[in-house]
Amino acid sequence: MAGNSYGTLYKVTTFGESHGEALGGIIDGCPSGIELDFEAIEVEMSRRKPGQSAIVTQRKEPDAVQFLSGIFEGKTTGTPIGFIIPNTNQKSDDYSHIKDNYRPSHADYVYDQKYGFRDYRGGGRSSARETASRVVAGAIAKQMLPEIKINAYVSSVGPIHLDTPYQDLDFSKIESNPVRCPDEKSAAIMEEYIRDIRKQGDTVGGVVSCVIQNVPVGLGEPVFDKLHAELGKAMLSINAVKGFEYGSGFSGSEMKGSEHNDLYNPDGTTKTNLSGGIQGGISNGMDIYFRVAFKPVATIMQTQDSLDNKGNITPMTGKGRHDPCVVPRAVPIVEAMAAIVLADFYLINKTY
């Protein structure tokens, strides 16, 4: 199976399955001499880990990171950083009923067809548990770029939207509620909606918005390696993501050029920022902002038709511990992937 690595100079490879012994990763290209804040890494992991509230999966995992290489006396050595995250709370029996069956809208069928064999326990390699390794790599990338501030938050759950412009939000309130929405009133409505969906044995999707501030001018490469193209690739690689838009996004297609152009100030900043901080695929120094759409979790606690490996349509009811809505736990994953992309382009920029 290829496709387990991301990046050019700051290169991240992840490994492991949801119900295997451990997850893990290798970070290649991290500069030497970075004094790591291990507590900050733990904070990022705790934001993503399961079992943190009543509106996420109740699988309990400490997600304790064990670093194996690339760090000495608390500093990066410049050699590959290897780490593992032990799995401690697997319940593989919850998945015995899908050993010979393919769950609707999961990767079960395509994995079996492509590889001729699959780990059906918890989705195996296709499980969102893989993203724990990305959060480790993203936490280190954030410490490479301390001046850059990355804040993601939940801006919609199902039909409930937070329409307040990000400039008017207090990002310090993102972690004040389990939904990770910085508007308390909207967060309460979203949380109640998720609880109701869970009671119905169903799931719901949502949108995570992300704002990146203090980005220097010049990150990104023209043509095929544009900054927004790499951000889009990184976000679309996250489990359950169905869409990505930055700046004015699709709404920009309804505007006139005279309305959409970002006019300059004498210092090179722009009066508006419909470009989303990126022009010609290169950061322009303005805030980068984008939105990531997540589908509803495919496993629902209702009976639906399934397909078995003999070609028979069979009824199936979801079992196990699953998120009724992924977006609260997706917030740190979106931040991590954004940090990885920026760290990679930062190192590429130093080659000029």
From Swiss-Prot:
<comment type="subunit">
    <text>Homotetramer.</text>
</comment>
<feature type="binding site">
    <location>
        <position position="280"/>
    </location>
    <ligand>
        <name>FMN</name>
    </ligand>
</feature>
<dbReference type="Pfam" id="PF01264">
    <property type="entry name" value="Chorismate_synt"/>
</dbReference>
<dbReference type="InterPro" id="IPR000453">
    <property type="entry name" value="Chorismate_synth"/>
</dbReference>
<protein>
    <recommendedName>
        <fullName>Chorismate synthase</fullName>
        <ecNumber>4.2.3.5</ecNumber>
    </recommendedName>
</protein>
<feature type="binding site">
    <location>
        <begin position="295"/>
        <end position="299"/>
    </location>
    <ligand>
        <name>FMN</name>
    </ligand>
</feature>
<feature type="binding site">
    <location>
        <position position="321"/>
    </location>
    <ligand>
        <name>FMN</name>
    </ligand>
</feature>
<keyword id="KW-0288">FMN</keyword>
<keyword id="KW-0285">Flavoprotein</keyword>
<dbReference type="GO" id="GO:0010181">
    <property type="term" value="F:FMN binding"/>
</dbReference>
<dbReference type="GO" id="GO:0009423">
    <property type="term" value="P:chorismate biosynthetic process"/>
</dbReference>
<dbReference type="InterPro" id="IPR020541">
    <property type="entry name" value="Chorismate_synthase_CS"/>
</dbReference>
<comment type="similarity">
    <text>Belongs to the chorismate synthase family.</text>
</comment>
<dbReference type="GO" id="GO:0005829">
    <property type="term" value="C:cytosol"/>
</dbReference>
<comment type="function">
    <text>This reaction introduces a second double bond into the aromatic ring system.</text>
</comment>
<keyword id="KW-0274">FAD</keyword>
<dbReference type="GO" id="GO:0004107">
    <property type="term" value="F:chorismate synthase activity"/>
</dbReference>
<dbReference type="GO" id="GO:0008652">
    <property type="term" value="P:amino acid biosynthetic process"/>
</dbReference>
<keyword id="KW-0456">Lyase</keyword>
<dbReference type="InterPro" id="IPR035904">
    <property type="entry name" value="Chorismate_synth_AroC_sf"/>
</dbReference>
<dbReference type="GO" id="GO:0009073">
    <property type="term" value="P:aromatic amino acid family biosynthetic process"/>
</dbReference>
<keyword id="KW-0028">Amino-acid biosynthesis</keyword>
<keyword id="KW-0057">Aromatic amino acid biosynthesis</keyword>
<feature type="binding site">
    <location>
        <begin position="125"/>
        <end position="127"/>
    </location>
    <ligand>
        <name>FMN</name>
    </ligand>
</feature>
<feature type="binding site">
    <location>
        <position position="48"/>
    </location>
    <ligand>
        <name>NADP(+)</name>
    </ligand>
</feature>
<feature type="binding site">
    <location>
        <begin position="239"/>
        <end position="240"/>
    </location>
    <ligand>
        <name>FMN</name>
    </ligand>
</feature>
<comment type="pathway">
    <text>Metabolic intermediate biosynthesis; chorismate biosynthesis; chorismate from D-erythrose 4-phosphate and phosphoenolpyruvate: step 7/7.</text>
</comment>
<keyword id="KW-0521">NADP</keyword>
